[in-house]
Amino acid sequence: MQTTHTHYRTHTCGELRMEHVGQTVTLAGFLENVREVGQNFAFAVLRDFYGVTQVVVENEAMWKAFKGLNKESTVQITGVVRERDSKNPKLPTGDIEVVPEAVEVLGRCRHNELPFQINRSREADESARLKYRYLDLRNPEVKNNIILRCQVVAALRKALLDHGFLEITTPILTASSPEGARDYLVPSRKHPGKFYALPQAPQQFKQLLMASGFDKYFQIAPCFRDEDARGDRSPGEFYQLDMEMAFADQEDVFAVLEDVLPPIFAQYGTYTVASPAPFRHISYRYAMDKYGSDKPDLRIDLTVTDATEALGACGFGPFEGNTVKAVVVTGFEGTRKQIDKLCADVEVQSGEKAYWFRYDENGEIVGGIAKFVQPMKDAVVAALGLEKGCFVGLTAGKLLAAQKAAGVLRSKLGAFCPNHMDKERYEFCWIVDFPMYEIGEESGLLEFCHNPFSMPNGGLEILKKAAAGEVDPLSITAFQYDLVCNGVELSSGAVRNHDPEIMVEAFQLVRLGEDDVKAKFPAMYNAFTYGAPPHAGIAPGVDRMVMLLAGEDSIREIIPFPMNKNAQDLMMGAPSFVTQAQLDELNIVCTKKEEDEAAE
């Protein structure tokens, strides 16, 4: 049974209504404001977690108690509830006020000036907000995001338990392994020169649970990756709904999340409509070709068309020898200034330029690169299926660059054109059949594209053919899948490779032999040699999910105590230097410190 009444209060600041008029009550909270309107007469606002209540000071003794208090002091007030003369319909407590008879200061605010106005903290500089996060969180708007996070996590936990999953925690101190991002390392005092790693994900542990005979596992798992921040990615640590199922394939995983997520999104989201099950399945290659992204926003009805054959030889320099992609928009009413901004935004986000022309109501090619398109108008109109009044946005470059730029262009145009985007809904889809391998941007060598523990389509046979040169490794797809909602990647998952022979063969293609696999993944390799069930899983990002539900653009808005973009905790002063004694105990010598870098 929930109770809000404590030793310090009989009611909360969001609780009092007309039925309480005439009662003597005790409230406790933060002094949000005091406004003097006459001699010994003032209005005060008391705020707690639950709401605000107006307090009316009407005598000298009470005014003396309030007069010397700074905003944000915590006080206990005992007084009588009465009906307001001037009601405030915007507040749940707007029909009443409290006339205090006794005031006790519980925690005095010793600062005459606050770093920012509490109720407008979101307008303040982010560094100030993060340094004084305990003040920022007093803002109801900021606080409500954290409440939403708690509600969503509770709903996810209940849903998974109802589906027969067991919540099992896995180790935080583990071994370093090559999972993609940089590890956070923890030195061992007892074993000089050796290090633990904070887990990038519970990947190996959850697979080992399946090998141990558990059927369904989940946890709200902390994950640690030393990677740069983005708007939808927090540096350092994040949380995911980690889950795994034994004797299951990807359709079994899909069925669980398709049952769990839509009602949670409809209940807690900004929008009340969520796409029903089954979610649409889109192959990775189709997504890149038609949407220019492996996380397409399906609320936008625009698609990408290949225009290489139609425009590659039009004489426009950037198109020559490159892939050309087009996004055709009907009913476009943007001005030249707005078009220029759209193109500039595409270049900033994708690193590639965007181009354009119109097919006007008179059937003429005008604007942008029209002079290059006009001579081949009929062929272009036919190839792109243009109707009079169309706007055509274009990108060009190597295949992947042109695709990604077109994806950004599609998103920008969709957001700009209300008739092409149904914003007020949650549109889910599964992206499937990801490439198993890719050529690394830095190494120029074959690398795993996503999860190295995924089962390849074609199994051992396709890997052996690739090793023999009979199949291009880049053509191999894996049983890997992403869950996407409104253009946000919520989760990645896969059918796991549970056969040690297939595991070794998969790693050999990226220049790691059987001995390397045994050395880097000893527990999992050995466990699988004892027989392991086919298993599959997924791990939706909790932070990213709540960000989407809250309608926020920055993931820091839904994390109680986030780091800044430079992976610094400004409130706690982390990372920080430690004492020489601590370093000596760990047998660590620092060869370079941050001041050295600043001096260079």
What does each of the following model-derived ranges do?
Residues 1-600:
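Class II aminoacyl-tRNA synthetase catalytic cores and aaRS-like
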